Amino acid sequence: RFEYDNLRDGALLILWGFAKKLILAERLGTFVDQIYGNYTQYTGMLFFFVATAAFSIQIYADFSGCMDIATGTARLFGIRLAPNFLRPYFSKTMPEFWRRWHVTLGNWFKDYVFYPISISKFSLDLNKKARKRFGNEFGRIVSSAIPILAVWLLTGIWHGPDWKYV
C-alpha cells in the first residue's frame, strides 16, 4: 500500500546519501589521494594529519552514504531497515566506536565469524593450553585474539581489498 511518508522519507534519505557520497566523500577522496599519492611533495606533519582526518570523514561519508541510499530505497517500498551507523565519531571509547560503526556488518561478523571461531574445538583447546601455560588472564587474552583478528581481517577485506582497510 502506498504511503506518502515512505515516499518522502525514502527520497530524502536517498538524496542525503548521494550528497554524502558524491559531494563530501568524492571531494575529500581527491584531496586525500593527492596528499597520500604525492607524499614526497608535502613536508611537515600538518598535511598528513589533515589528510588522515579527511580520510576518516571520507570513509564515513562513503559508507554511510551508500547505506542511506540503500535504506532510502527500501523505505520507498515500505521496508524499514535497521540503522547502520550510529554517529560513531561521537563515541567516547574505541569499543563504543566499533559498536556504532557499520552496526549490521559488525553484528553479522559477530554472529557468523567471531562466535563460531570462539566456540570451535580448536579455540577451546587453545584456551586450555594457553591458560595452563600463561595463566588464566593472559591465556584468555591469547585464545580470544584469534577470533578478533579473524573478524578484523575479514571486515577490512569487506570494506575494500586494499592494505589500508586490512
Regions flagged by a language model, labelled:
Residues 1-166:
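Membrane-embedded transmembrane alpha-helical bundles that form the catalytic cores
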